[in-house]
Amino acid sequence: MGIKYQKIGDVVIVKKELSEDEIREIVKRTKCKAILLYTTQITGEFRTPHVKILYGKETETIHKEYGCLFKLDVAKIMWSQGNIEERKRMAFISNENEVVVDMFAGIGYFTIPLAKYSKPKLVYAIEKNPTAYHYLCENIKLNKLNNVIPILADNRDVELKDVADRVIMGYVHKTHKFLDKTFEFLKDRGVIHYHETVAEKIMYERPIERLKFYAEKNGYKLIDYEVRKIKKYAPGVWHVVVDAKFERI
């Protein structure tokens, strides 16, 4: 059977309509409780999927990845399989001396593995979508974490200054527009994990130019960086992350 599908917990996502036979085959093969068709691209600021339920009713599930539990409603919340390596990398990027700010926490995609395995002093996990925030709080409990403070807010309205050794910017729509706030969060020295979607031909230039521009504007200088590819986003366009080190001038 050549049907492409993605399994999140015990819910399956497909990208095209299925026949009754195909539905039966997937249910038999995966033991899933629901099959969802993602009808259009994920849209809007809150990254909400547009879905049609092809089988079952219950779309809330618990997905296990890398020893972490993620509760989510797959009909309401996006789960990106393409970011799995980055979630693993973030798990061990920090240490117990750090304070981390996750500016776009979602349901805890990066916060949960990082808090669990790196054991930083504290993670401020900021999320403005109330549905995602609900699951973020659930996931903090599910994973028995006591070093995460969830904050329901637009990160630009959060009053935290000079607190972060590390800031995660895991969002790819005009991410640079949030950099002024990022430098407010950052201590005198720190690391920013800056995500962006960028045309392949300027992939190693544009993100760095943007980081340098906002650093200078906020009294910092870029001292070291590395650009990493996460996944192909569209033809000729990559989702990249820049690990960038800064210090205050």
From Swiss-Prot:
The keyword Zinc does not apply. Its EC number is 2.5.1.114. Disulfide bonds: none annotated. S-adenosyl-L-methionine binds at residues 80, 87, 127, 154-155. GO terms for molecular function: transferase activity, transferring alkyl or aryl (other than methyl) groups; tRNA 4-demethylwyosine alpha-amino-alpha-carboxypropyltransferase activity; tRNA methyltransferase activity. It is an enzyme of class 2 (transferase). CDD domains: AdoMet_MTases. InterPro entries: MeTrfase_TRM5/TYW2 (IPR030382), SAM-dependent_MTases_sf (IPR029063), TRM5-TYW2-like_MTfase (IPR056743), TRM5/TYW2-like_N (IPR056744), TYW2_archaea (IPR030867). It catalyses: 4-demethylwyosine(37) in tRNA(Phe) + S-adenosyl-L-methionine = 4-demethyl-7-[(3S)-3-amino-3-carboxypropyl]wyosine(37) in tRNA(Phe) + S-methyl-5'-thioadenosine + H(+). NCBIfam families: tRNAwyosineTaw2Meth. This is tRNA(Phe) (4-demethylwyosine(37)-C(7)) aminocarboxypropyltransferase.
